[in-house]
From Swiss-Prot:
Source organism of this protein record: Maricaulis maris (strain MCS10)
Residue sites binding substrate per the record: 18
Gene Ontology terms, MF aspect: arylformamidase activity; formamidase activity; zinc ion binding
Source domain of life: Bacteria
Family: Belongs to the Cyclase 1 superfamily. KynB family.
Manner of cofactor binding, per the entry note: Binds 2 zinc ions per subunit.
Positions with a binding annotation for Zn(2+) 1: 48, 52, 54, 172
Pathway the protein takes part in: Amino-acid degradation; L-tryptophan degradation via kynurenine pathway; L-kynurenine from L-tryptophan: step 2/2
BP term (GO), one: L-tryptophan catabolic process to kynurenine
Catalyzed reaction equations: N-formyl-L-kynurenine + H2O = L-kynurenine + formate + H(+)
Name listed for the protein in its UniProt record: Kynurenine formamidase
Chain residues that bind Zn(2+) 2: 54, 160, 172
Assembly mode: Homodimer.
Length: 209
């Protein structure tokens, strides 16, 4: 059986979330007992909790919601690369373009170790020029371990709008700890939530034959 890596965050009460966004909670509704044969819980969370896919409607009022977004790009061969440098943005020069080699799905690692327990306001965003070059090489899906393609303080959302121009897809909040750079099969299907601007997902990388 091919080796598999789980690149999702664990949804839990102390999950770091974007400042001001909804904290995750899992509350008991029914519990197993003399009058109830099952356990049932109620979830409270943001559409951007943990590893998630942004829908086009997140950054474009006329964009599709996550339930209407085609699924093809969320499954298939991908390339995981580590960004060099330590500036606030991942610039084109920070990526190994020979390794990317025209991949349709590109995952970009910015953390040596993912900050699972603390919110990092200084995560490395992707520069819009990097998005443009990825699009020019044939990339259709970008996945990052950062909380967003754009900086926390951005009001212009330059990277997201570069994605919009090229009809690309976005995965954010992935965890690449313990996964070597290389070629993999990506499986990262977002939940089908009508009207939602994003959705959490269980993302995995599978070793290619």
């Amino acid at each position: 059986m091919a080796k598999m890596w789980d690149i999702s965050q664990t949804l839990r009460p102390d999950l770091p979330v974007w400042p001001g966004d909804t904290a995750f909670a899992c509350d008991e509704v029914w519990s197993i007992g003399p009058d109830c044969p099952v356990q049932v819980s109620r979830l409270t969370l943001s559409t951007h909790s943990g590893a998630h896919a942004d829908a086009p409607s997140h950054y474009d009022q006329a964009g599709d919601d996550i339930a209407s977004t085609p699924l093809e790009l969320y499954v298939g061969p991908c390339r995981l690369v580590t960004a060099s440098g330590n500036g606030p943005h991942v610039q084109p020069a920070d990526l190994d373009w020979a390794a990317i080699d025209g991949a349709t799905r590109v995952l970009v690692r910015t953390y040596a170790k993912f900050p699972a327990d603390d919110w990092d306001p200084d995560f490395r965003a992707l520069h819009a020029d990097t998005i443009e070059r990825l699009a020019a090489t044939g990339c259709r899906l970008i996945g990052v371990d950062a909380a967003s393609l754009d900086p926390q303080t951005s009001k212009t959302m330059d990277a997201h709008h570069a994605v919009q121009r090229h009809d690309m897809r976005i995965l954010e909040g992935l965890v690449f700890d313990g996964v070597p750079d290389g070629h993999y099969e990506l499986i990262a299907l977002p939940l089908k939530i009508a009207g939602a601007d994003a959705a959490p997902l269980r993302a995995v990388l599978r070793e290619l034959p």
